[in-house]
Amino acid sequence: MREKSWFREYGLILAAGVAVGIAALILTASGNPKNMGFCIACFLRDIAGALGLHSAANVQYIRPEIIGIVVGAAAAALAAREFRAKAGASPACRFVLGMFVMIGALVFLGCPLRMVIRLGGGDLTAVAGLVGFIAGILVGVVCLKKGFSLGRAYPVRMGEGFVLSGILMALLGLLLLVPTLLKFSEAGPGSMRAFWGISLAAGLVVGVLAQRSRLCMAGGIRDAVMLRDFKLLSGFLAIWGTVTIGNLVLGSYSLSALSQPIAHSQYLWSALGMALAGWGSILLGGCPLRQWILAGEGNGDSAVTVLGMIVGAAVSHNFGLAGAADSVAEDGTYVVGGIGTAGMAAVAIGFAVLLAITVTHLPKTEAVSRD
């Protein structure tokens, strides 16, 4: 009886984690960059580039994985009668938070999901990101305990919940039918891509399972700290375990802090970037993956958030905020990447903005006592 209860509680979330890990491995084997089989931040950066929102030629492509995630989540929510069109909870603040979550993630060179995938590939530089991510979540937990809230969303017309899905389906149509309207990378990460059908299918599977299991990278650590509930965290660990085992079997596991794919060794700024992403994710109620799932379920506030993320990706590359990967020069010299002064300033500004949003969304009694 106890075994059945355990399976009922953890079975779906573990299956979702394993599926995400397998999807990441398949996508990498099919052409996506190494240690980047699935990365919400990287995919949004590429989509922003494909739409001409930034001019970084190496990161431009409409990633079907994102389209699949949202459509899969919408289909799962409709089938389970959980689709709810709602909006109206601090949309402007959510847009800004989405921007800075993305800026922080691109300083690190990956979203929380890619952080786990990088760890599963043996990338020791991602440990700094994990430490920062946990620290940011802990700050967010303190904010929640103080009463932080972006407010309540209210029901809206059903059609509102399908707007984002419709936009993404239109992008898929452009990709397949009128690709000349879009920009495509001829070199760099944007040029490394799986066949669109494989990418779309992987996104659909992940979207369905993530919707049903409530999979969330930030939520797992938040619930473990606040509620001593390790259910969501088990999904986080399942992704890491699956990717690690898969890489070992495939011979692509490389335990090192040097020459890792699309990664840099400025550990402090990796940690700070992910701290910004972690804190912002808690204030938003979920990591970037979770925001896309919620948007697929009809949540207009999450739709605004992910649009903010796309703008954040564009801003990161237009103003040189994103991290640059370590590389090896022609003469064999190891060149450390990382971020420049603009990126450092953006992270500092991001922390200030998150603090301001936190203070202005505390209960009045808490805000008064703080003053």
Functional labels for PLM-detected ranges:
Residues M1-D371:
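Membrane-interfacial helix-loop segments of redox and metal-homeostasis proteins
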